[in-house]
UniProtKB/Swiss-Prot annotation:
Belongs to the ATPase alpha/beta chains family. Its EC number is 7.1.2.2. ATP binds at G148, G149, A150, G151, V152, G153, K154, T155. It is found in: Cell inner membrane. It catalyses: ATP + H2O + 4 H(+)(in) = ADP + phosphate + 5 H(+)(out). NCBIfam families: atpD. This is ATP synthase subunit beta. Pfam families: ATP-synt_ab, ATP-synt_ab_N, ATP-synt_VA_C. It comes from Pseudomonas putida (strain GB-1). The keyword Membrane applies. One of its GO terms (molecular function) is proton-transporting ATP synthase activity, rotational mechanism. Produces ATP from ADP in the presence of a proton gradient across the membrane. The catalytic sites are hosted primarily by the beta subunits.
Length: 458
């Protein structure tokens, strides 16, 4: 255990000088004596000086304080003891429920599974959300991104997915809150508690008010816990809200470390940092990790380097659109922009595939006709186009659905719709079985039977 002393402090970046023969390795954890602060080595500057990033507040630190090298990377508790607990980036409990009592700790920097260890699969994961199951179905052991700008419903969608999948899935889940609102973390905890699934979820929070070091590493902390469950042969769910804040923390750290910025001011190592995280989120022959990641899209621009880098790693992308949210259709998923590798007749079957493509065709055609309708009105359309527009408007409304986690706001009970009912409903609308029903009947209902019942009351 070698010791050094602080020689410079610039915000969250601290330079520590060690004797030249015992300079700590990159990613080693250092402890500041007399303070609770942990530092992580990022660079070796030469002459025994290392540049570190603080995993916590640097208030009260000063030059000359003694720092001890722990000789290992940051390690966090793993295993069953973490379930039902809220932890910070270092694995310390922050739920005031006593120590974690873990049997094992694991370093947060682990190599990704080798190519030979990885396993693929084509099993579908039913979510109970119509638009997702129809147009961008999830794969078990796959990676899903929820893309959206500010305030279009990423967190609500994620909470609904967690509720539906965790309730039905009955396996273990890990939730990593990366640079999000503390209020949402609190809501999430109570939501899990009320749904009686808290004893199957490990929660790791590094919220908006934390220093950049915490936000940069908290995703790795959550992932390390998920990897342990996977290696024990479980199918794990990993939820990350929000992966963009992980990138942003990397940008802040990169600037503080004095690296040259790249496009739009992002860190030059953006693709590598994203790859290091994403390559570890994978299924092996022991068990699977299915991950759902919320991705904030700055200024609704999907070509921004951060969301664009994330796209490459995902199996399914759920794009939330402000235009659809402005119509009052929630979940505001854009069925034309959202994609999935599972949308293949060999995987999901012909009926599902044809229905999904039929829905997309009708909505795309309606989008093209909107300009004509705006200029000339509906009367100028051919009879076929009038019929298509009527069906498109019904489909658009039928893609909406009341959520369980939003009952408090909407006042209407949540609905879980099975994949079979989803396909039956949409294929019925496409065939014209429900042309006689008013379009309002399709808004905010679960299955097609509820739409028929609602039509009787209109």
């Amino acid at each position: 255990m070698s010791s050094g002393r602080i020689v410079q402090i610039i915000g969250a970046v601290i330079d520590v000088e060690f004797p030249r023969d015992v300079v700590p390795s990159v990613y080693n954890a250092l402890k500041v004596q007399g303070a609770e602060t942990t530092l992580e080595v990022q660079q070796q500057l030469g002459d025994g000086v290392v540049r570190t990033i603080a995993m916590g507040s640097t208030e009260g630190l000063k030059r000359g304080l003694d720092v001890v090298d722990t000789g290992a990377a940051i390690s966090v508790p793993v295993g069953k003891a973490t379930l039902g607990r809220i932890m910070d980036v270092l694995g310390n409990p922050i739920d005031e429920a006593g120590p974690i009592g873990e049997e094992e700790r694991r370093g947060i920097h682990q190599p990704a599974p080798s190519f030979a260890d990885q396993a693929g699969g084509n099993d579908l994961l039913e979510t109970g959300i119509k638009v997702i199951d129809l147009v961008c179905p999830f794969a078990k052991g796959g990676k899903v991104g929820l893309f959206g700008g500010a305030g279009v419903g990423k967190t609500v969608n994620m909470m609904e997915l967690i509720r539906n999948i965790a309730m039905e899935h009955s396996g273990y889940s890990v939730f990593a809150g990366v640079g999000e609102r503390t209020r949402e973390g609190n809501d999430f905890y109570h939501e899990m508690k009320d749904s009686n699934v808290l004893d199957k979820v490990a929660l790791v929070y590094g919220q908006m008010n934390e220093p950049p070091g915490n936000r940069l590493r908290v995703a790795l902390t959550g992932l390390t816990m998920a990897e342990k469950f996977r290696d024990e042969g479980n199918d794990v769910l990993l939820f990350v809200d929000n992966i963009y804040r992980y990138t942003l923390a990397g940008t802040e750290v990169s600037a503080l470390l004095g690296r040259m910025p790249s496009a739009v001011g992002y860190q030059p190592t953006l693709a590598e940092e994203m790859g290091v995280l994403q390559e570890r989120i994978t299924s092996t022959k022991e068990g699977s990790i299915t991950s759902v990641q919320a991705v904030y899209v700055p200024a609704d621009d999907l070509t921004d380097p951060s969301p664009a880098t994330t796209f490459a790693h995902l199996d399914a992308t759920v794009v939330l659109s402000r235009d659809i949210a402005s119509l009052g259709i929630y979940p505001a998923v854009d069925p034309l922009d959202s994609t999935s590798r599972q949308l293949d007749p060999n995987v999901i079957g012909n009926e599902h595939y044809d229905t999904a493509r039929g829905v997309q065709y009708v909505l795309q055609r309606y989008k093209e006709l909107k300009d004509i309708i705006a200029i000339l009105g509906m009367d100028e359309l051919s009879e076929d186009d009038k019929q298509l527009v009527a069906r498109a408007r019904k489909i658009q409304r039928f893609l909406s659905q009341p959520f369980f986690v939003a009952e408090v706001f909407t006042g209407s009970p949540g609905k879980y719709v099975s994949l079979k009912d989803t396909i039956a409903g949409f294929s019925g609308i496409l065939k014209g079985d429900y042309d006689h029903l008013p379009e309002q009947a399709f808004y905010m209902v679960g299955s097609i039977d509820e739409a028929i019942e609602k039509a009787k009351k209109l």
